[in-house]
Swiss-Prot record:
InterPro entries in UniProt: EF-G-like_DII (IPR053905), EFG_II (IPR041095), EFG_III/V (IPR035647), EFG_V-like (IPR000640), G_TR_CS (IPR031157), P-loop_NTPase (IPR027417), Ribosomal_Su5_D2-typ_SF (IPR020568), Ribsml_uS5_D2-typ_fold_subgr (IPR014721)
Primary role: Abolishes the inhibitory effect of tetracyclin on protein synthesis by a non-covalent modification of the ribosomes.
GO terms, biological process: response to antibiotic; ribosome disassembly; translation
Gene3D superfamilies, alphabetized: 3.30.230.10, 3.30.70.240, Elongation Factor G (Translational Gtpase), domain 3, P-loop containing nucleotide triphosphate hydrolases, Translation factors
Source species: Enterococcus faecalis (Streptococcus faecalis)
Lineage: Bacteria, Bacillati, Bacillota, Bacilli, Lactobacillales
UniProt keywords, alphabetically: Antibiotic resistance, GTP-binding, Nucleotide-binding, Protein biosynthesis, Transposable element
Annotated GTP binding sites: 10-17, 74-78, 128-131
Protein name: Tetracycline resistance protein TetM from transposon Tn1545
GO MF terms, alphabetically ordered: GTP binding; GTPase activity
Disulphides: none
The family this protein is said to belong to: Belongs to the TRAFAC class translation factor GTPase superfamily. Classic translation factor GTPase family. TetM/TetO subfamily.
Amino acid sequence: MKIINIGVLAHVDAGKTTLTESLLYNSGAITELGSVDRGTTKTDNTLLERQRGITIQTAITSFQWKNTKVNIIDTPGHMDFLAEVYRSLSVLDGAILLISAKDGVQAQTRILFHALRKIGIPTIFFINKIDQNGIDLSTVYQDIKEKLSAEIVIKQKVELHPNMRVMNFTESEQWDMVIEGNDYLLEKYTSGKLLEALELEQEESIRFHNCSLFPVYHGSAKNNIGIDNLIEVITNKFYSSTHRGQSELCGKVFKIEYSEKRQRLAYIRLYSGVLHLRDPVRISEKEKIKITEMYTSINGELCKIDKAYSGEIVILQNEFLKLNSVLGDTKLLPQRERIENPLPLLQTTVEPSKPQQREMLLDALLEISDSDPLLRYYVDSATHEIILSFLGKVQMEVTCALLQEKYHVEIEIKEPTVIYMERPLKKAEYTIHIEVPPNPFWASIGLSVAPLPLGSGVQYESSVSLGYLNQSFQNAVMEGIRYGCEQGLYGWNVTDCKICFKYGLYYSPVSTPADFRMLAPIVLEQVLKKAGTELLEPYLSFKIYAPQEYLSRAYNDAPKYCANIVDTQLKNNEVILSGEIPARCIQEYRSDLTFFTNGRSVCLTELKGYHVTTGEPVCQPRRPNSRIDKVRYMFNKIT
């Protein structure tokens, strides 16, 4: 059986959850249509999603049609950072991008389409809600061509009120765009030679799967118009991005979820091989897990299974698998699955409104952060404050809503601040010797640091021979340095430098790896004091799309938000501004754009990198460590 995984994507209120229900109903997977208004849909399965009528977490269901199983991944529709979009789309074989016939292409539609093209996912446009009054499809087509892609092929005729029906075009009516995009076919056509239907279909299929041609279909999910035809299109046009005939197992965890009974569930997309119940499965070079229970979605219901094939999505109840864990051979992952999640850019302090709910809050954050790698938290051991790190405002708003509506915890939140990094200013060396006060550890360590270009990260090397200092001591030094890099002179992560372990001494009767592990961060702090550090702040690259009449305002406002516009383009009465902006300023700039363009602007952002800051350094309190802080204090007193 053929297995394909598709995503249903759209801007808010375009009807994507309703379309999913219609696909399930028309294929026979369910016997009664669910309703977003009544909160009875299959895919918006949390109370928060049903109450708000939006999709917050990736939901999965399926149907079977003829010899094809279709897993539908109803992906989130509220995303404020492209990395979040990429993560949720990476498991798809294809996508249906909904466009409301009444509203046309919206800002969210453009963000989603941008991500689909970048990742390389074949996409069908489905114009929904054609049964509403006042529809002008020619305007919608023009909107798609101007804001998404001109490379579309209209596959159907539509009769609006009062007949309300959708019919496939005849062969000759739908091939113009296919012919125009191929020089060989165009020359053959203009010379009067007969074009075979097979070669036209093959050309359309090639361009569709290369993401250079986008078929357009029509219907009404609510009133079940055009859905049967869409099911045929889905099962015929899409194919699975799996390794056919490859026996080696490869799968990736793309979602972690907690059931109502607090069971931890890992969702896995299989890319090759067969997964059997009770199989020992490698998840790293040294680690294996045993499959004791396995589920998949069959006709909209979760069912236990004994084995799963390449292309399938399986669900395991497991405490050890993490988001992005790979089962089996990593080399068999598709290239788009190798996109790394960025670090959070913002942080804030959260506390429960009712102090007695503190443990409930911590338990809830543990589950939420486990499900979302772009959300992190820790408890400051000195102040006992709960520090939450995240990427963007919408993510924070959804987290607050989840805490209140799913976990019944109300919180108080402070204004978010940017997460900075630190880089050494110059080369420096420092050594702390054994038995020289105030060193209480049975170890000598000498380190050097040197700045590297922005974006290099931390590079570590040891020039101390393994013949002299064995691997366990060397590992301890590296672990201590890794810990020390978490807090530089101003309390931020240290990056973009080369750290060299240049000197080590131990006393064989008494020295232990713990001595080296404890001493290393103290030596690192002293060598950083000698080198000095500078603060780096995150910068985003942005691309703004806005009506041409707002060019002057958008351009002139940029310096107010420290934005640097590097390119300006005019296209189809629309201005496209590209540039860079500090992460701390993007939310205000984006809000301002939305306000003065009346919601007609789109702002796409991605992490560009880190730039050196100017002005007074921003400090954050150091996290205490009872085992080394007294020694740190004594060394800081004498240096």
